[in-house]
Curated annotation (Swiss-Prot):
GO terms for biological process: canonical Wnt signaling pathway; cell fate commitment; neuron differentiation. This is Protein Wnt-8. The gene is WNT-8. Palmitoleoylation is required for efficient binding to frizzled receptors. Depalmitoleoylation leads to Wnt signaling pathway inhibition. Belongs to the Wnt family. Ligand for members of the frizzled family of seven transmembrane receptors. Probable developmental protein. May be a signaling molecule which affects the development of discrete regions of tissues. Is likely to signal over only few cell diameters. Its main location: secreted. Disulfide bonds join C69-C109, C85-C102. The keyword Disulfide bond applies.
Length: 128
């Protein structure tokens, strides 16, 4: 008689919210770098010595992100001036994402919010 055992191993991703939070923290401490002779060096001296290469565990970027608040046709950014905030049709239909859309589009770019109410009348061709 013999015995048999099977082992199965697999990798599993962590919980999405935990991974997202870890990425957000790394994003907030990301290092602007220059690529010199195959190495990445901090562009601005913060807590690191500019002569010391960036650590492999650091999140690094080579250039600043464009300002998406401003019109920039070169990169296809339409800016936020004059854009409509996303809203649901009824009070119960507004998600948290929709409720925060004005803040994302306007106030985070230094713009104010102008509220307008539009009433649309249409014929439904009803027959009684």
């Amino acid at each position: 008689s013999g015995s048999c055992s099977i082992q199965t191993c697999w990798d599993q991703l962590g919980a999405f919210d935990i991974i997202g939070e870890a990425l957000r923290k790394r994003y907030e401490t990301a290092v602007l770098v220059d690529y010199i002779n195959g190495n990445l060096f901090p562009s601005e001296v913060k807590s690191k010595d500019a002569s010391e290469p960036v650590d492999k565990s650091d999140l690094a970027f080579l250039e600043l992100s464009p300002n998406y608040c401003q019109l920039n046709s070169t990169i296809g950014a339409v800016g936020t001036l004059g854009r409509e905030c996303l809203r649901g049709r009824g009070v119960d239909e507004v998600s948290e994402w929709e409720a925060r859309s004005c803040k994302r589009l306007c106030t985070s770019c230094g713009l104010g919010v102008k509220r307008t109410k539009v009433v649309v009348s249409s014929s439904c061709n009803c027959k009684f």
